[in-house]
Amino acid sequence: MHESAIVLAAFGVGHPRSLPGITKVVERVRQSFAPTPVRLAFTSQQIRRIWRSRLTRPLWVKEHPEVPSEVLMVRGPLATIADLHEEGFREIVVQSLHIYAGEEFEDLRSCLRGLASIQAVKPRWTPFRRLALGRPALGQPGIEHPYPQDLERAALALAPDLDQADEQGAALVYVGHGNPYYPSGVYQELEMVLRRTHPASLVAVGEVEGAFSLDYVRERLRQMGTQRVLLKPLMLVAGEHAHSDLAGEDAGSWRRTLESQGLKVECDLRGLGENPAWAEIYLENIRQAAASAGIAL
């Protein structure tokens, strides 16, 4: 029996149409690390409750055959790791599917630290031999994996999006989730890398929640002098933020606001998880986390 397993920890999403940003990554990881078991977990309790409530509605489940059972019955990282322990797995790599090392990632890291600290009186009963946490796509602070290199890697994965905008004669505007309580300056560092690696392209990176808001992006677009905008979520999935805050019909959405300024706006509502090159970032982070912890997958 395999004694190692992989847990993919995403924030989660509640709408079935947005699931490919997650399920495509899960599928890719399973293909790459077979026969190592791969489990999905959502860090958002609110999202988990949404799916759990749907389990009590058989008609809804029947009408949405595209939703995998592992999503309908999704659990949090702590419960998922506990389930694996009960099944006999003592070496686990938890890969964060978050974009950057923000609040959700720090909470996940704290959870793993707590589990790793458990020591039984008799060593053979210590729950886990090894626990490892794979860093987010845009890296994390520290010297083991310098995050500027992760930004370069991310920029390479995003190159097709800049090509798409260039073909349209448009400025590419990425919109991340952000966080009003946690630093998100890595978005602007990513923008700087994209501008340096694609000097002929017009690009800006904003966030729904945080300092680099729509006002920041509007000023950047004014400086560029562009008339066309390609708006894309810098998120694993194109969920509620993408469909409402970015592309919604409400007058306050990013699309409607930019259109009111005379700009022609196209929205490409595909999550980063649907980009094979972005999924490959997580695969590489899993390999590196496992190797650093001495876990064989």
Where are these predicted regions, by residue range?
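Active-site-proximal alpha-helix that buttresses catalytic centers in soluble enzyme cores
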Residues: M1-L297
